[in-house]
Amino acid sequence: MKFAVIVFPGSNCDVDMFHAIKDELGEEVDYVWHDRENLDEYDAILLPGGFSYGDYLRCGAISRFANAMKAVQKAAEQGKPILGVCNGFQILVESGLLPGALMRNENLKFMCRTVQLRVENNETMFTSQYEKNEVINIPIAHGEGNYYCDEATLKQLEENNQIAFRYVENPNGSVSDIAGIVNEKGNVLGMMPHPERAVDELLGGAEGLKVFQSILKQWRETYVVNA
């Protein structure tokens, strides 16, 4: 399986993503600059955290216009797994690939610590290796991680089982304690916590590795077992 880590000016978690895929998952991965127009050779696309374009205007508001995002849109339409973490989640929302918005944290402060997440839906291609309602420890590092959507959108997310992760103790004011959501098709996941920073016990825990293992399992079952 071949992964692409999209690198924007200001990305700073691309190295963590690369490490998670190459060193922990053992799969092929490339850094891909944001001006790349074709991502057809990749099986999965990863949008890392950071401060793309300095977070000017809004977080992710400029990155959505990058050439690579047109290719990401195409990959999403093809059903390829797309994972956006932190700033990557913000870019997915700004691009319209996921509903809602990410606002300033309720306390107006940047937060960097480990939090507990509850796995709300373990039937997605990103969460199949977890147990439903499993509680995992994953780091956060954001100032604008307060997820917001209107009541109609929240109802739709709940009815369609699109809420992948919730905070056990809400750190930022996100509506309905939402930490991560998938699109209706189930192949695009956006989450504020950083699973790529929790893939090795030496780094404090490996409970985020199952996100990437789930992606790999889905791909193998689809393209290897059925080949």
Swiss-Prot record:
Reactions this protein catalyses: N(2)-formyl-N(1)-(5-phospho-beta-D-ribosyl)glycinamide + L-glutamine + ATP + H2O = 2-formamido-N(1)-(5-O-phospho-beta-D-ribosyl)acetamidine + L-glutamate + ADP + phosphate + H(+); L-glutamine + H2O = L-glutamate + NH4(+)
Compartments where found: Cytoplasm
Keyword check for Translocase: no
Any one Gene Ontology molecular-function term assigned to this protein's record: glutaminase activity
Domain Glutamine amidotransferase type-1: 3-225
PROSITE patterns, sorted: GATASE_TYPE_1
Signal peptide: none
Top-level division of the source organism's lineage: Bacteria
Coiled-coil boundaries: none
Gene Ontology CC: one annotated term: cytoplasm
Gene Ontology BP, a term: 'de novo' IMP biosynthetic process
Record pathway: Purine metabolism; IMP biosynthesis via de novo pathway; 5-amino-1-(5-phospho-D-ribosyl)imidazole from N(2)-formyl-N(1)-(5-phospho-D-ribosyl)glycinamide: step 1/2
Enzyme Commission number(s) of this protein: 6.3.5.3, 3.5.1.2
SUPFAM superfamilies: Class I glutamine amidotransferase-like
Keyword annotations: ATP-binding, Cytoplasm, Glutamine amidotransferase, Hydrolase, Ligase, Nucleotide-binding, Purine biosynthesis
Cross-referenced CDD domains: GATase1_FGAR_AT (cd01740)
Entry keyword annotation includes Nucleotide-binding: yes
InterPro entries: Class_I_gatase-like, PRibForGlyAmidine_synth_PurQ
Location, primary (coarse class): cytoplasm
Subunit structure as annotated in this protein's UniProt entry: Part of the FGAM synthase complex composed of 1 PurL, 1 PurQ and 2 PurS subunits.
PANTHER family: PHOSPHORIBOSYLFORMYLGLYCINAMIDINE SYNTHASE SUBUNIT PURQ
Its job: Part of the phosphoribosylformylglycinamidine synthase complex involved in the purines biosynthetic pathway. Catalyzes the ATP-dependent conversion of formylglycinamide ribonucleotide (FGAR) and glutamine to yield formylglycinamidine ribonucleotide (FGAM) and glutamate. The FGAM synthase complex is composed of three subunits. PurQ produces an ammonia molecule by converting glutamine to glutamate. PurL transfers the ammonia molecule to FGAR to form FGAM in an ATP-dependent manner.
Name of the featured protein: Phosphoribosylformylglycinamidine synthase subunit PurQ
